[in-house]
UniProtKB/Swiss-Prot annotation:
Its main location: cytoplasm. The gene is fhcB. It is found in: Cytoplasm. Pathway: One-carbon metabolism; formaldehyde degradation; formate from formaldehyde (H(4)MPT route): step 4/5. This is Formyltransferase/hydrolase complex Fhc subunit B. Involved in the transformation of 5-formyl tetrahydromethanopterin (5-formyl-H(4)MPT) to methanofuran (MFR) and formate via the formylmethanofuran (formyl-MFR). One of its GO terms (cellular component) is cytoplasm. Keywords: Cytoplasm, One-carbon metabolism. It comes from the Bacteria. One of its GO terms (biological process) is formaldehyde catabolic process. Octaheteromer. Part of the formyltransferase/hydrolase complex fhc; composed of FhcA, FhcB, FhcC and FhcD. The keyword Cell cycle does not apply. The keyword Cytoplasm applies.
Length: 362
């Protein structure tokens, strides 16, 4: 595995030592990104506890939009398999659900189980790209965007607005469902939009059955939520600066901390692809990144260590969006994986061990 220290090539042992020295000299370190396999996430939380650092996943906007709605009023959710097998009416909100194969897979099937079995499936969209390749009824979003549109739709559904508007027709179609599903991306609609959609789903369930199918972010955010919950009892943005895990989604936003000058060192963990943060390199930083990624270069950070990519060069437990669970992903071609391939968990553990040897602790 390749490694760099201050732009120069180094072996992994030297890079681990440099990373430990950098973190030992910091007062308010941040561990960010967290786009990695579960074992690496676990190692990151252990390292943060040792350092007294805070953690912030790159998936934060999606995670907290969903968690905000959940904490405000709960959620009624379903799975991909249940949607394909049972739903006769599906409302697709926004643009992101049209990316990938989900909508095409839904459109290719008909309800085969439950009360809607044998019915024709109706696909409806609100504020989407009006994809002509898949037959559906499209409703344009208001000029104010998706959040305003969802507010108007819920008002028509509750009877607080009346008339012949398009949203009135959409509300009637939703109430006519035998088993309905709303598909949306929490980050795209935002916390207020997610809360509005869950409220609409509760309203619809007064007379029929309706659920949400929320899209997971592509950066292992849901795995981070689960691991943080069983490790700290809280959501992912936690800090260990006062010897115990404290959750604060605003205070431990890494971009805010770094912009405000609160953090004096950072560790960026991305064994899986993740968008590079604007702050990377603006303060002493360690980058643990997947081999072959754009960030696998000496200029990325003060210390750069490349590791195996889970599901490709190494195995690892990852969020499986199709199944809606954390599942183990084998290396795609283990025969081609060099024996010396480092894992993110292994590197983080070695850094923590060196810090403990140096007497560094929260």
């Amino acid at each position: 595995m390749a490694a760099w220290v201050k732009g120069g090539a180094a072996d992994v042992d030297a890079a681990v030592e440099a990373a430990a020295d950098l973190l030992a000299a910091s007062r308010v370190p941040v561990l960010a990104g967290l786009s990695a396999e579960v074992s690496a996430l676990r190692a990151a939380y252990r390292l943060a506890e040792t350092l007294g650092a805070s953690l912030d996943p790159v998936s934060g906007p999606s995670v907290y939009a969903e968690l905000g709605a959940l904490s405000a009023g709960g959620a009624m959710s379903t799975t991909r398999a249940e949607t394909i097998g049972r739903a006769d009416v599906i409302l697709i909100v926004g643009n992101r659900p049209w990316d990938g194969e989900l909508i095409a897979e839904i459109a290719a099937a008909a309800p085969s189980r439950g009360r809607a079995a044998g019915s024709e499936r109706a696909l409806l969209s609100l504020g989407g790209p009006q994809n002509g390749a898949i037959r559906h009824v499209a409703y344009a979003a208001d000029a104010g965007g998706l959040t305003i549109s969802l507010g108007h739709l819920r008002a028509f559904a509750k009877g607080h607005l009346a008339g012949e508007a398009a949203f009135a027709d959409l509300a009637k179609r939703l109430f006519a469902a035998q088993y309905g599903v709303i598909v949306y991306d929490p980050e795209e609609v935002g916390e207020l939009g997610a809360e509005m959609l869950q409220g609409l789903i509760r309203d619809l369930n007064e007379s029929t059955r309706f659920f949400a199918l929320t899209l997971a972010d592509p950066f292992q955010g849901r795995a981070a939520v689960q691991l943080s919950a069983w490790t700290t009892g809280q959501a992912p943005r936690v800090g260990f600066g006062r010897h115990q895990p404290e959750h604060d989604s605003w205070r431990f936003d890494s971009a805010r901390q770094i912009a405000a000058g609160e953090a004096d060192a950072a560790l960026w963990l991305a064994s899986l692809p993740a968008p590079r943060p604007a702050w990377l390199g603006s303060l002493p930083t360690i980058a643990i990144v997947g081999e072959g990624s754009q960030e696998a270069a000496g200029e990325t950070a003060e210390v750069v260590i490349t590791v195996g990519v889970p599901g490709q060069s190494v195995g690892g437990a990852l969020w499986n969006d199709r199944r809606g669970v954390i599942a183990y992903a084998e290396a795609s071609d283990p025969a081609k994986t060099p024996a010396e391939t480092e894992t993110a968990a292994g590197v983080l553990t070695r850094i923590r061990d060196r810090l403990i040897e140096k007497g560094v602790s929260c």
